[in-house]
Each structure stands twice: as C-alpha cells, then as structure tokens.
Regions:
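Secondary-structure boundary elements
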Residues: 145-200
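Hydrophobic/aromatic-rich core segments of domains that either
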Residues: 210-279
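Solvent-exposed loop/turn segments at secondary-structure junctions
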Residues: 183-188, 206-208, 232-236, 256-260, ...
C-alpha cells in the first residue's frame, strides 16, 4: 500500500514595518486586523508566490467529485504540478489538512502516476499565522525517464487491451482486466517498484498497490470509472478498487483474486472470483476503507461475477446445482466456481460434491478433481 511521504518545512517570516509606513498605506482609522490581513496578502504573493487557477481535467473523476470547491482547486493544482513535472506550486489553501486530502484524492483518481512517490510541503508563516503553503512533489524519475517508461507501459497495456472486443459490456471489461492482471502478474513483496504500475507492466510482479493502480489505469482506458481505495484488509494495509458499472458501484480486489496471495491454493495460480464486482457486504468483514470521504453503498448484484455467470444459488438444491456443474463440465470448463447464499447451504453442497464425491456423477468421465474454498464468501471452486 502506498505511503504518503511528507516532509514539513516551516519558514517563518519576520516582518518589521514602521508605524509611519502603516499609516501611509492604510490610514489611521483602518482596523488593525485589516492592516495585518493586507500585509499577509502581500507577503503571500511576494514570498510564496501567487496561486494559479488551473482548468480542471478531472470533473468526471469520483474522488474529485467528493471535494468542496476549495479542495478541488488544490487538487487541480497538485495534479497539474505533477503532470507538468514542476518542482513546486503554491496552493490555494493555508490548511495542511486540505492539502493532504486533495493529494489523497488525486492518488485515488490517478493510479498511473508512477514517477513520484509522495510530497513535501513548505509552510510560510508571519509569526504564528500561516500565510501560504507550497506543494513539492518527490520525483523518483526525471521527465525523460518518465517518458521512456511510459512508452513501455503503454506498449504492454495496449497489447493486453487489444484483446477486448469493441462491443464488450462493462462487466466483460472488468472481468477481462481482473483475469488478465492475475494471470500475467505475480504477487511478490520483493518486487521492484511495487508501489506503482511499473511493477505490473514492466516487472510483472507486484503487491496490492500495484494491482489496484493498474486495475484503475486499465479500466479507465476502457471507459470504466474507477478509483483506488486504500485502507486495511485482514488487519494489514491494503489497496483495492471501487468501480461504476452501468450506473452501479462495485468493489474489485485484484490482489485477493490471486489464489497465491491468500494461500488458498499452492499449485498453479488460479482466480478467486469472489472479489470481482463485489458488494459492500461481501468485503465488510475483512476490508475497511480509510479514504478521506464516505464510500458509496455497493448493493447491486447485476454485474457480480456469480450472478452474471449463473453460479449463485439461493438454496442447496443439488438437482439444480448438479445440472449447472454438468453444463460447465460439458462446455470444457476446467474451473467451476459455485457460490451459495449462506454458510449452512455452502457446507451442505460441499458435503455432497466433495465429501461424498458426488461431483463425479455430474462430471462423467472426470478421473480426478481438486478444489479450494472461500468460506467467508461461501464459494467452492472445483478444478478439473
């Protein structure tokens, strides 16, 4: 999970202005607070620099939309600074919390910003009063290096995305990205650049931050609104995604979809579809968002993998479930995922298919099967 690298430098400005000069500038009847404000405004422009209003390119981005007007201005200034590879920028706030919130929202909306790793900021003050803040990105690549690396990223991303049909639905696009990243990229805590997308597209090894950033980046290329969500999962720092499909919100956790990550399966890497277009209640027991804004309720099942594929069952009806297993088997599927609505039914289905080996009745001709479980989501995966 990506950390915000902040170094806070305070620069105190000691100002000596004679009473006579103040009288000339402001007149003897001007309230002292107005005089002080005028002085601070002049200092801000002289020392910090005049803040520049930046045209927004992010009005369609989810995290941006959660901000107030002042926060959006700071967001725009941060993004412009990073995209233009500037050394620093004076921001339109004197509140350090606004600066941090705007930064976190930029990182949520733009998973592709691999060329910097955080920021420093200067606080300028006139005695105890803050008169300005200056944002300074911490770049890890030069502008030329960034351009060369971006070309490598684009080459791989374009190759992958070329396989997506032009008429693909939102669901099909998310399924493709989810499967492609899990198949193409290994989970490796020792991987280089694992806090950005370079580890995915160039190194092919990453951790949760790389998976989440790459998922957001690829989905955006396909026209799917998505953000990177940071928080905790299973008691550890983690990153995953929030997506909008056909007007409904869902969660995607590509990292947890990799069976090697959770240790569900130690053989050939498989895909756990429980984290593809999941609901809030699916992740509530394990995932906790730490985003600086409230997350939407993800309640729809329309584009959930199991509903879409007809693999979700409300009851342990073995005639219905067995028929579905046979259908999948005859279609040549090597991996059959079944999801039950509750744990009791899940255990009953597992008893029939696995413990009593009834799976062989539905997969006539199969000589051996293996399986792995995700009991928290009531998912049984059969490998043929």
């Amino acid at each position: 999970m990506k950390k915000i690298v902040k170094e806070h430098n305070k620069k105190r400005i000691v100002l000596i202005i004679s009473f006579c000069m103040s009288a000339v500038l402001f007149g003897g009847c001007t309230p002292a607070r107005l005089i002080q404000q005028a002085i601070n405004d002049q200092l801000e422009q002289a020392v910090v620099g005049e803040t520049q209003q930046v045209s927004s390119t992010s009005t369609d981005r989810y995290a941006y939309q959660q901000l107030q007007t002042e926060e959006q201005q700071v967001y725009d200034q941060i993004l412009d600074c990073v995209m233009q590879h500037k050394d620093c920028v004076a921001v339109s706030t004197k509140d350090e919390n606004v600066l941090e919130k705007a930064y976190e929202c930029v990182m949520a909306d733009y998973g592709e910003l691999f060329w910097f790793s955080g920021y420093q900021y200067n606080t300028y003050s006139n005695f105890d009063q803050i008169i300005g803040l200056e944002f300074m990105p911490s770049y890890i690549y030069t502008e030329q290096e960034r351009e060369e690396l971006q070309q490598q990223v684009d080459m791989v991303a374009n190759t992958w995305l070329a396989e997506v049909p032009a008429d693909a639905t939102d669901y099909e696009k998310t399924k493709f990205v989810y499967e492609t990243l899990i198949k193409q990229v290994d989970y490796d805590t020792e991987s280089e650049n694992n806090q950005n997308i370079l580890s995915v597209f160039i190194g092919k090894k990453t951790v949760c931050q790389g998976y989440a950033d790459a998922t957001q980046y690829l989905l955006h290329q396909l026209g799917i609104p998505a953000i990177v969500v940071t928080g905790t999962a299973g008691g550890e720092n983690h990153a995953w995604n929030l997506v909008n499909l056909d007007g409904e919100y869902y969660y995607i956790d590509t990292t947890w979809g990799n069976t090697h990550f959770l240790g569900e399966w130690q053989g050939t890497k498989k895909i756990d579809y429980g984290y593809l277009n999941a609901r809030t209640q699916d992740l509530a027991q394990t995932h906790t968002s730490q985003m600086p804004f409230a997350m939407p309720a993800c309640e729809s099942v329309v584009d959930n993998y199991f509903y879409r594929e007809g693999l979700y069952f409300e009851a342990a009806d073995m005639a219905v479930i067995g028929q579905k297993v046979t259908q999948e088997y005859l279609q040549g599927e090597k991996e059959i995922c079944l999801r039950m609505s509750n744990l009791q039914d899940y255990l009953q289905v597992k008893e029939h298919l696995i413990d009593k080996e009834e799976v062989f009745q539905y997969c006539n001709g199969a000589r051996e099967i293996t399986y792995f479980e995700n009991q928290s989501l009531c998912i049984l995966t059969i490998l043929l």
